Swiss-Prot record:
Belongs to the class-I aminoacyl-tRNA synthetase family. This is Leucine--tRNA ligase. The gene is leuS. ATP binds at residue 631. Coiled coil: none annotated.
Length: 877
């Protein structure tokens, strides 16, 4: 009898209610089973989830459900990264308080996530804007302050003129603010910093232990930390060219071997010498101001046009007093990196070459590529940056660059310049302390108080939390806390005199740098429960976008170490395994030059071509490129619409099935429809066979078709489990498609009453195993199918969500036959299928019976037959 069509809307709501009522996914910290902590990067509550969220959380849910089935005590929590500028922007635009806007969005997105059927422990939910959360963050801040890991200093900062706030270097992308896209300016402000540089060496060395992270991410962090070993060289200023009080320029270089190729020295716009020279020099002052319009990050420097201002100052070459080099103020040198001064060797650095060509400076090659002639070798438009031998370098000629480095260092370390060595070896790091001050309202208040008499001191712990005031106005840009007199003005905790609160709030990346720790015991009064944190950490599998490779992941690695120093955790690394998933992308569409939504168009096949038109008017629509889903290009698919049309399991199945998880997946309506047809097919096969299988005990087949059914499903159990372990979800999906194809005929026989007892036992086992294997990807369908089969696994009543992962029989997984390629005189002519344990004589005899071998021998005998066991057969005719 034909089964009723599967209704995902009814089934999914039912099973979600069952799981919630049974508290199926709540995790007990006292459970003695082996732990497994899986976590997807928690979302910013922007208003609605998108298909990228669906893919990210579906992947994490597959891992969580699979590990739960494998017997682990799984922690799979969810929360909200809820502070940030969009809430303030919404407050200004829509006249709604950031808190109200944020919590409304959380409610909407929580409903959406719940509709996906994710196996999340919602009892541990928090938002980083919850007072209970940022109270503990303020406690952490004070702990780190007392451990000397927080400092306050004046420095050049990246100022976003649109968002009116400071940005960390990592938040400046191609010279622009990471959120606003505005060109970043430099300003000098007093800021709060976390001393991440105290851990530079540790953070670098720790990357070698993270063998379950993508190498690309580790490389990005290595480059960002940027350890370099070089030489700090003092260049004496030429007599008569320098202002009073200046006698030298100190330069840090990683290439002292190229000193004889030097063409200039460049100093930062903020170098003391540059500042002195700008006094009374309007042209130089103007140039320095122009430099300050750039960001303070290396990325900003790399993208900006390289410019310099010739100061007229000269320095002497360290090895030749008669050789003078011009000193430029340059926009590509930062005071915060090295010494704020560099020497330029145009032949062997592309930036220096571009600069030298622009200002017509001499280009002298000093490293000769292997096989080149020193007399004829020259530099064109591209600097030579590889290895070779030294030339044009006097006493260094003929050395390797490495040997030349050491020779230069050795000589200059022994050379006295005004009572000190002319050079010293130095290790430098590109990493800078993390500036966390933000001039915003919607963030965690920094718990410090400023007193003219006592200085800056922490808020007493008994007075925490420092809560954000609700009665603020967003009628103009800037920080409303600066304008809130009753909140800002307080008494000094030391002297009792008039004082003021710190009005800067913390960078929102602080909030996400320790949330994974809070999930281990979010009910605690202290920031962490040390026992729970040490039990659950590190996170076994962390899943999120590669765009967080530096910012969030590096900060979290620092924060874990800082929390260890403060006694809150006992681990060094926060995330044992890291997986960076690809994006969900979609075609773009335009009508009359305007972006249009996929929901507003119709696509048809006409004469073999896809043609798009507007639904309402029939007007032609241009089908554009496939791009990341974005509201601006209107190529967004709303998960609510997909779930309403097809169900959550279809959405989950599709985003897992179409591409390797690390690559982008292209969302198509046809793909979603195909996934839904598969959902319906599984349901129909199971539901129609269920009456015949409901009361049958599961038992593997031992012969004939029943044995074939059992072999197929046991092989799938092994393979799908291996695929999930490797996060190769698309391969696991493909195997399940294949298994359903294999089982469909036998299940139809059972539905038609044509299966014998052995086949029924094999099918009952196979169907249970199929249901359990699909459960991590399509959990609602799996529960509905098992209910149709009587709600039992191996004879015991259970929810699929609580059932163990099926166990394969090794004997059924091993192939009894093997296919051997057969060559004749070294060329493959065909294959031989034979028992895996066949001896050499049996293989040779079977080969002689093959038609293509008989034809090649033409009635004769072979000279010999070479058998490579389990590999290949070669017939020598």
């Amino acid at each position: 009898m034909a089964a009723e069509r599967y209704n995902p809307r009814v089934a999914e709501a039912h099973w979600q209610k069952v799981w919630e009522e049974n508290r199926t996914f709540e995790t007990d910290n006292s459970d003695s089973r082996e732990k497994y902590y899986v976590l997807e990067m928690f979302p910013y509550p922007s208003g609605r989830i998108h298909m990228g969220h669906v893919r990210n959380y579906a992947m994490g849910d597959v891992v969580a459900r699979y590990k739960r089935a494998k017997g682990f005590n799984v922690l799979h929590p969810m929360g909200w990264d809820a502070f940030g500028m969009p809430a303030e922007n919404a407050a200004m635009q829509n006249k709604v308080h950031p808190k109200e806007w944020t919590y409304q969005n959380i409610a909407t997105m929580k409903r959406q996530l719940k509709s996906m059927g994710l196996s999340l422990d919602w009892s541990r939910e928090f938002a980083t804007c919850d007072v209970e959360y940022y109270h503990r963050q303020q406690m952490l801040f004070i702990d780190l302050y007392e451990k000397g890991l927080v400092t306050r200093k004046t420095s050049k900062v990246n100022w976003d003129p649109v968002d009116n706030t400071v940005l960390a270097n990592e938040q400046v992308v191609d010279g622009r603010g990471w959120r606003s896209g505005a060109l970043v300016e430099q300003r000098e402000l007093t800021q709060w910093f976390f001393k991440i540089t105290d851990f530079s060496e540790e953070l670098l060395a720790g990357l070698d232990t993270l063998d379950q992270w993508p190498e690309k991410v580790r490389l990005m962090q290595r480059n960002w930390i940027g350890k370099s070993e070089g030489l700090q060289v003092r260049f004496a200023l030429a007599a008569g060219t320098a202002p009073a009080g200046f006698s030298e320029v100190e330069v840090y270089t990683t290439r002292p071997d190229t000193l004889f190729g030097a063409a200039f020295v460049a100093i930062s716009a903020d170098h003391p010498l540059a500042k002195k020279l700008s006094e009374g020099n309007a042209a130089l002052s103007s140039f320095i101001e122009e430099c300050h319009q750039q960001g303070t990050s290396l990325a900003a420097l790399e993208t900006a046009e390289k410019k310099g201002f010739d100061t007229g100052i000269k320095v002497k070459h360290p090895f030749d007093d008669n050789w003078e080099l011009p000193v430029y103020v340059a926009n590509f040198v930062l005071m915060e990196y090295g010494t704020g001064a560099v020497f330029g060797c145009p032949a062997h650095d592309q930036r220096d070459l571009d600069f030298a060509n622009k200002y017509k400076l001499k280009v002298t090659p000093v490293v000769l590529p292997k096989g080149e002639d020193a007399a004829s070798f020259s530099i064109g438009e591209t600097a030579y940056t590889d290895d070779g031998v030294m030339i044009n370098s006097r006493f260094l000629d003929g050395m390797t660059p490495e040997a030349a480095f050491n020779e230069v260092a050795s000589r200059l370390e022994k050379t006295d310049l005004v009572g000190r060595p002319q050079a010293v070896r130095k290790v430098q790091f590109r990493l800078r302390d993390w500036g966390i001050s933000r001039q915003r309202y919607w963030g965690c208040p920094i718990p410090m108080i400023h007193c003219e008499s006592c200085g800056v001191n922490p808020v007493p712990r008994a007075d925490l939390p420092v809560k954000l005031p609700d009665d603020v106005e967003f009628d103009r840009p800037g920080n409303p806390l600066d304008r809130h007199a009753t909140w800002r003005h307080v008494k000094c905790p030391k002297c009792g005199g008039d004082a003021r609160r710190e009005t800067d709030t913390m960078d929102t990346f602080v909030d996400s740098s320790w949330y994974y720790t809070r999930f281990t015991a979010p009910w605690e009064n202290e920031p962490t429960n040390r026992k729970a944190a040490d039990h659950w950490l590190p996170v076994d599998q962390y899943i999120g976008g590669i765009e967080h490779a530096i910012l969030h992941l590096l900060y979290s690695r620092f924060f874990t170490r800082a929390m260890k120093v403060a006694g809150h955790v006992g681990v060094d690394e926060p995330f044992k395994g890291l997986f960076t998933q690809g994006m969900v992308v979609h075609e773009t569409y335009k009508a009359n030059g305007q972006w249009v939504s996929p929901a507003d168009i119709r696509i048809e096949e006409i004469d073999g071509k896809r043609v798009a038109t507007m639904l309402d008017s029939g007007a032609p629509v241009e089908i554009g490129s496939i791009e990341k889903m974005s509201k601006s290009k209107k190529n967004v698919v709303d998960p609510d619409d997909i779930i309403a049309s097809y169900g959550a399991d279809t959405a989950r199945w599709f985003v897992l099935s179409d591409s390797p998880p690390e690559r982008d997946v292209i969302w198509t309506e046809a793909g979603a429809e195909g996934a839904h047809r598969f959902v319906q097919r599984i349901w129909r096969l199971v539901a129609e066979a269920a009456p015949a299988l409901k009361d049958v005990a599961p038992k593997a087949g031992t012969q004939g078709e029943a044995l074939g059914v059992s072999k197929a499903v046991h092989k799938a159990v092994k393979a799908v489990g291996d695929d999930i372990e490797k996060l190769a979800f698309n391969r696991g999906v493909a195997r399940l498609y294949e298994l359903v194809n294999t089982l469909s005929g036998a299940l139809q026989q059972a539905a038609d009453g044509k299966a014998d007892a052995e086949m029924k036992g094999a099918l009952r086992e196979a169907t249970e195993m199929l249901v359990l294997m699909t459960a991590p990807m399509m959990p609602h369908l799996a529960e509905q199918c098992l209910a149709e089969l009587g709600g039992k696994v191996a004879g015991k009543e259970t929810l699929v969500a609580r059932a163990p992962w099926p166990v394969f029989d090794p004997a059924l997984v091993v192939e009894n036959e093997i296919v051997l390629p057969v060559q004749i005189n070294g060329k493959k002519r065909g294959d031989l299928t034979i028992a895996r344990d066949a001896d050499q004589a049996s293989i040779q005899q079977a080969v002689l019976e093959l038609d293509f071998v008989k034809a090649a021998l033409n009635g004769g005998s072979p000279k010999k037959i070479i058998v490579v066991p389990q590999r290949i057969v070669n017939v020598v005719a």
